[in-house]
Amino acid sequence: IRDYRGGGRSSGRETIGRVAAGAIASKILNELGISLCAYTKAIGPYVINETEYNYSEISQNSLYMPNNNIAEQAGQYITSLMKETNSCGGVIECIADGLPVGLGEPVFDKLDALLAQAVMSIGAVKGVEIGDGFQAASSVGSKNNDPFYVENGEVHKKTNHSGGTLGGMSDGSRLIVRAAVKPTSSIAIPQETINTAHENTEIVIHGRHDPVI
C-alpha cells in the first residue's frame, strides 16, 4: 500500500530506521575507539569552508551546522523558501576517526564502494564524495597525492586528500564522506506533469513537506 499523503519508501521518514540503527552502531564503534561526527556542511548557497568549522557549535543550532553564523543565514534562507512553498538541497559531511588500517577489499568490496552504496541508498542523495572528491578531478597528481612520513616508528600522511582510503581500504587517517542531497521534490508550486491517461497536466502537492531534508 502506498500512502499518497506521504510516508512511503521515497519519503524522508524512511530514514528513521537508519537513524535508530546508526545511533546504536555509533555507541558500539565508540567502545572500539572509533568516533563519528556528522553535520550539515551546506544548505543551498550557504556553504561552510573547513577553515570556518567550529565543531562545538554543531549542537547549538537546529540545522546541525558547525558554524552558528552561517546556520542563522541558512535558517533565514529556508524560511524564505517556505513562504515561497519552494525547497533547496544541501551537503552532509561525516568524519570518522580511529579506524584501523585495512578495512575494505581491494576490488569489488572497496571501502569507498560500500560507503557510496550505503549513502546513495538514502532517498534524495544524488552524489557522494570521499576526501577531496570531485575537486580532485581538477587537481594534478603532484598535489593530490598524499605524502607519507615516519614519526616515532609510525607511518603518517602529511595531507588527507584521499579522505582516509587508499586502494579501496582504510589507511588509518580520518575518513571523510560527503553526501549531496537534492531539493525536496514535494513542493506546492505548480509543476508540469502527466496523468494516468497520458495527458499533459499540472500538479500542486499539498501536505506536510519539508523545504530541505
For each feature predicted by the language model, list its residue ranges.
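Glycine-rich, mobile lid/loop segments that gate access to catalytic sites or pores
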Residues: R2-V107
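Short acidic, glycine/tyrosine-flanked loop/strand segments centered on an H-E-D-like triad
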Residues: I1-G8, Q191-V212
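Glycine-rich anion/phosphate-binding loop at the beta-strand->alpha-helix junction
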Residues: T85-C88, I92-E202
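Unusually extended, aromatic-enriched hydrophobic runs near protein termini
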Residues: Y64-Q73, A137, S162, I205-I213
